[in-house]
């Protein structure tokens, strides 16, 4: 399956980045003809169709049958879960990850809760500061950050990432929310540049190392996600904490890694950022923007794969939009997986049942289309067929 239309990419290079007309976006049938012929699972209930759009975080280093997360996976046919090592409630205790044997047991329990054994079990494992499998838990934990990776030989980079993929696979993690393909174009950027999460300012260099990363993950049966569309490298603020406007900082070149990777790779998923860019959408940040997700990523770029939001509990979203409105906008924007990490604060934690019931109410009120949810289900099923 071809996940990006190359012709649309070449057209994009010569096009302005003016916002896509709302009416055109609403009237188009987004990528339906391109969705792989994978039907929605038979007998999937409304609750399960909704649940198949959700990836959630949870408290616990185990998932026995009576646990809430296991019940939620089984009842709602969740798309997946996201695992963390740090516990936001008690920093002295692990949230989900405390050791190799423990994590292997946890992922097996989680898959046993699922109906198809293909639950997406995800972590952020980039290297450097962003790696959940740390040495203090018995893992390697010393994978270099992206800005250090580019100083190594290609053979060494391949070795590092193959070892990373093998380690993830060995403990049952099948989805790595990486690589980061943001460009290092703002030296004052704390969340990307100063943490060394970017492979550089040159798109071709970023693509080179992101390709090695993706190939290594795929060789070990681990799915990947390009992030953070349409580009977080130029930003000054941190979307974890609050609203971030990149209107006067963002550059079109930040789209280039996505275009180039589309020519050589079958891209699994794309993660959308919470950055606000008035030139692309004068009203909403990227994650909640129909003009950016359905308009630019799907319509202009021709991407028909799975689109996942960044954590919708981050300050950029959580502080500005209520839960119901966030769900409505995120679904209508064209996202397939809505990520709720339940990680950033105790107050922001939300029950899966609350998410499902809110979306169900949105469907019943006509504010969200069931057809859009079923289209997302098909894209998710197609993605899971890779596992």
What does each model-found stretch correspond to?
Residues 209-225, 253-267:
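Phosphate/pyrophosphate-binding betaalpha-module
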Residues 1-9:
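Sec-dependent signal peptide recognition
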Residues 72, 77-205, 233-246, 273-288, ...:
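Enzymes and membrane/adaptor proteins characterized by extended Gly/Ser/Thr/Asp/Glu-rich
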Residues 13-14:
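C-terminal motif of bacterial Sec signal peptides marking the signal peptidase cleavage site
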Residues 52, 79, 115-119, 173-174, ...:
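Short, well-ordered coil/turn segments that N-cap beta-strands
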Residues 17-75, 290, 299-300, 318-387:
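Preference for extracellular/luminal or secreted protein segments
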Residues 107-115, 169, 211-218, 262, ...:
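Surface-exposed amphipathic alpha-helices with a cationic face
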């Amino acid at each position: 399956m071809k996940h990006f239309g190359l012709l649309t990419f070449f057209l994009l290079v010569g096009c302005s980045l003016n916002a896509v007309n709302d009416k055109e976006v609403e009237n188009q049938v987004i990528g339906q003809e391109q969705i792989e012929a994978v039907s929605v699972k038979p007998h999937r209930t409304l609750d399960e169709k909704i649940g198949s759009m959700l990836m959630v975080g949870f408290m616990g280093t185990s998932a026995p049958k009576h646990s809430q997360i296991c019940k939620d996976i089984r009842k709602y046919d969740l798309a997946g879960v996201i695992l963390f090592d740090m516990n936001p409630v008690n920093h002295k205790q692990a949230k989900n990850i405390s050791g190799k044997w423990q994590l292997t047991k946890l992922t097996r329990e989680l898959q046993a809760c699922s109906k198809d054994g293909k639950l997406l079990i995800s972590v952020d494992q980039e290297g450097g500061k962003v790696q959940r499998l740390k040495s203090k838990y018995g893992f390697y934990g010393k994978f270099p950050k992206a800005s250090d990776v580019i100083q190594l030989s290609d053979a060494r980079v391949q070795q590092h990432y193959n070892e990373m993929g093998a380690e993830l696979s060995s403990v049952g993690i099948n989805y790595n929310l990486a690589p980061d393909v943001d460009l290092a174009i703002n030296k004052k950027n704390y969340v990307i540049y100063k943490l060394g999460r970017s492979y550089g300012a040159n798109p071709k260099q970023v693509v080179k190392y992101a390709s090695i990363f993706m190939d290594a993950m795929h060789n070990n049966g681990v799915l990947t996600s390009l992030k953070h569309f349409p580009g977080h490298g130029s930003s000054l603020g941190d979307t974890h904490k609050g609203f971030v406007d990149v209107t006067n900082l963002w550059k079109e070149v930040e789209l280039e890694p996505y275009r180039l990777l589309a020519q050589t790779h079958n891209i699994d998923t794309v993660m959308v950022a919470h950055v606000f860019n008035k030139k692309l959408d004068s009203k909403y940040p990227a994650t909640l923007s129909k003009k950016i997700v359905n308009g630019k990523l799907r319509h202009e770029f021709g991407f028909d794969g799975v689109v996942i939001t960044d954590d919708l509990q981050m300050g950029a979203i959580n502080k500005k939009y209520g839960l119901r409105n966030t769900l409505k906008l995120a679904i209508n924007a064209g996202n397939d997986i809505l990520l709720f990490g339940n990680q950033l604060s105790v107050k922001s934690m939300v029950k899966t049942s609350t998410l499902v019931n809110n979306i169900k109410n949105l469907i019943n009120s006509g504010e969200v289309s069931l057809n859009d949810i079923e289209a997302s289900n098909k894209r998710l099923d197609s993605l899971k067929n890779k596992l």
